[in-house]
């Protein structure tokens, strides 16, 4: 038995479930847990940022992301590549969708945890253009 999805290969209904541990990666601002990395389909992360730290001011050429704050308070900056950025204070439950080429940065006011769901186009792991980075990674796709 198979289930068909438009634009996708058939998925077998009798495919076994897979149990595994999320991949943990230390970052200069905290750490992330990648709990789903289905290349060509989607990525799911839980990201922990310690108070006072910021992720890079960045954008993606192809990848799109949705970020939802689970706990804490954060400032989210976002806007066009060639325009002014908007800053918005986020609390638990606040969510933002970021299409490709939207500049964005998350700054933790308190310790924060947020969920990130994104597309996974070919090369998604390197699809980051860092405009500013407090940890010396500007202009790189280093983790």
Task: Please identify what each model-predicted range represents.
Residues 1-43, 54-56, 88, 128-143:
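A short, N-terminal "cap"/entry segment at the start of jelly-roll beta-barrel domains
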Residues 80-101:
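Short acidic-glycine-tyrosine-enriched beta hairpin
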Residues 62-79:
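Glycine- and acidic-residue-biased ligand/ion/polar-headgroup-sensing regions
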Residues 66, 110-130:
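A short hydrophobic beta-strand segment most commonly corresponding to one strand
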Residues 45-63:
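Conserved short histidine dyad/triad with adjacent acidic residue
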